[in-house]
Amino acid sequence: MLKVESISKDYREFKLREISFDVREGEHFIILGPSGSGKTVLLEIIAGIISPDRGRILLRGEDITGLPPEKRNFSYIPQNYALFPHMTVFDNIAFGLKLRKIPRKEVARKVREVAESLGIDHLLHRKPRTLSGGEQQRVAIARALVVKPELLLMDEPFANLDVQTKSKLIREMKRWRKEFGFTAIHVTHSFEEALSLGDRVGIMLRGRLVQVGDVRDVFSKPKSEEVARFLGFENIIEGVANGRILKVGDLRIELPREVWGKVRVGIRPEDITIFMEGVKTSARNVFKARVEGIEDLGALVKLTLNLGGIILRAFITRSSLIELGIREGEEVYASFKASAIHVFP
């Protein structure tokens, strides 16, 4: 449906370099990256707000690179929602329909239908300043969907919401997608949004799209250490592999497949299980470790573990920390399955 070809742009402090990807009909495509990686600039280039220095954008095979935003039939939801403060919710939602010269009765019908679907039909007489963040977001989404856009562009759509409102809107976004059948490009730094909503994801780091693929594949099989570290592989270790065994100092770690020679592997902290004593487990990799650090992260606690000179980090729940009675300096057992190990190419 949409094809982005070799887009480059120097814009203020941002530099985009040779960005290429495609978006399929009916897909929810996530652009995932940290703040400052150029995600919003890329989205605004696709929207037609900013012109690229090089490259082109094709919609159904037609070059739309020079087409103004109003001719693209895309709906763009910026991070601040950009609702008109002097207009009611009804008039905000109706704005795009009125620009298209839709008859008044048809405008009223379409606005009420989309407002009912998004659960805001009781707010149509209100002004944006009287709404909560979640309600404002629903209004912005309703305004975007009511015109039946070719493509929905969303810039950090849930960034300004509290955790509960965000979780609710993510669940409802799945329902709205089924109901309205839209195609979306969704910019975010949130792993939760990517995993919950995305079909495919493009990882954007320092102005480059460094990996594109199915969301689950990218998260489980990052193609570089840079991508892996961004996606939460805090434990990256180097050793010498002899078939299914990786030798790291005095440790012998079972690998998910045969590998030979010097390699580097990654293990997520959440894939390491902690026991206070040796137990029978399906995990082949079980090692005695000393707890060298305990970091409180809220619901989770990060443990820094020393396995014979090899430092690993593991996540456990706060309740598990209390139940197990883990303290700094104590010995524990750390286990992880061979299948949890990612071998870097």
Swiss-Prot record:
Membrane topology category: Peripheral membrane protein
EC numbers for this chain: 7.3.2.6
Molecular-function annotations in GO: ABC-type tungstate transporter activity; ATP binding; ATP hydrolysis activity
Record keyword Membrane present: yes
InterPro entries hit by this protein: AAA+_ATPase, ABC_SmlMolc_Importer, ABC_transporter-like_ATP-bd, ABC_transporter-like_CS, Mo/tungstate-bd_C_term_dom, Molybdate/tungstate_ABC-ATPase, Mop_domain, P-loop_NTPase
Enzyme class: translocase
Top-rank lineage group of the source organism: Archaea
Mop domain segment(s): 280-345
Keywords: ATP-binding, Cell membrane, Membrane, Molybdenum, Nucleotide-binding, Translocase, Transport
Entry's Gene Ontology cellular component terms: plasma membrane
Catalytic activity, as annotated: tungstate(in) + ATP + H2O = tungstate(out) + ADP + phosphate + H(+)
Chain positions recorded as ATP binding sites: G33, P34, S35, G36, S37, G38, K39, T40
Stretches assigned to the ABC transporter domain: 2-231
Subcellular location: Cell membrane
One Gene Ontology biological process: molybdate ion transport
Subunit-structure text: The complex is composed of two ATP-binding proteins (WtpC), two transmembrane proteins (WtpB) and a solute-binding protein (WtpA).
Function according to Swiss-Prot or TrEMBL: Part of the ABC transporter complex WtpABC involved in molybdate/tungstate import. Responsible for energy coupling to the transport system.
Family: Belongs to the ABC transporter superfamily. Sulfate/tungstate importer (TC 3.A.1.6) family.
Cross-referenced NCBIfam families: Mop, tungstate_WtpC
Protein name: Molybdate/tungstate import ATP-binding protein WtpC
